[in-house]
Amino acid sequence: MMIQGFKSSNQEFKFGPWQLTAIKTHIMKSADAEKLAEEMSMPCLPEMMFGDNVLRIQHTSGFGIEFNAKDALKVVKSNQASLKVACAEEWQESRSDSEHNKEVVKPYDWTYTTDYKGTLLGDNMKLNVIPTTDKINTEKLKAREQIMFFEEVLLFEDELHDHGVSSLSVKIRVMPTSFFLLLRYFLRVDGVLIRMNDTRLYHEADKTFMLREYTSKESKISNLSHVPPPLYTEPNEISQYLPVTQTIYEKLEFPSQDLEKAVLVDTKNVTAL
């Protein structure tokens, strides 16, 4: 997922009472990355760490949600134990002839696996997260609608010393009366495992909530012998072959139902800034 011909950018888009912001800038400098790693008690950060990149969705009242690399890495440690059992030993055996072997397999989650689902914004008011059985209507998303705004932001990427890839990216598309966001963590450890953690966020302009769906999938490479190897490097293609290991359905309710009138979008007010 390397970015070719990269240029820093700060894109903003207004969707009714929502301000959408996508900031894309350069990889963190080594000194800054080392300092941040120390603050987070991590041996090192991903090779390509975009510490200032962010995709933010914020209401005029102040509440909202954003997606950034620093907060995503803060929850990596919680996956350490399960990763060591599921992957690290097998990876080490499969790469016993690698000169980087001892360097890569360290006592921390060296794949940066994260179940991050976003950072809630707001001081006095925040989105209220509650479990739900409601699901995103995928049929609506398949409908042909004008794309008013689209952005994709890479948050971090690491090539695992040329033995795979670990990456986190987020993209959003805005239609006339709704927006849809996908945050994707993708891991491929060559010859060992493929893992994908997806967070989908959907909001319709006349609703006082967003729907958030988190899905975790993974499979050992040995169980994917029926899949053409070239697909291993294509997240969109390999996804259908990975068994689901966890799903979480949530409703992100607005802080006050009194805001219902404020969320009705005036399509004339859907503009890029």
UniProtKB/Swiss-Prot annotation:
The UniProt entry, under Pfam families, shows: TIP41
Name the InterPro entries for this protein: Phosphatase_reg/MetRdx, TIP41-like
Keyword entries, A-Z: Cytoplasm
Q: Give the main localization category.
A: cytoplasm
- Extract one GO cellular component term from the record: cytoplasm
Q: What family classification does the UniProt entry report for this protein?
A: Belongs to the TIP41 family.
Free-text function comment from the UniProt entry: May be a regulator of serine/threonine-protein phosphatases 2A (PP2A) and 4 (PP4).
Q: What is this protein called?
A: TIP41-like protein
Q: Which organism is it from?
A: Xenopus tropicalis
**What is the organism lineage in this UniProt record?**
Eukaryota, Metazoa, Chordata, Craniata, Vertebrata
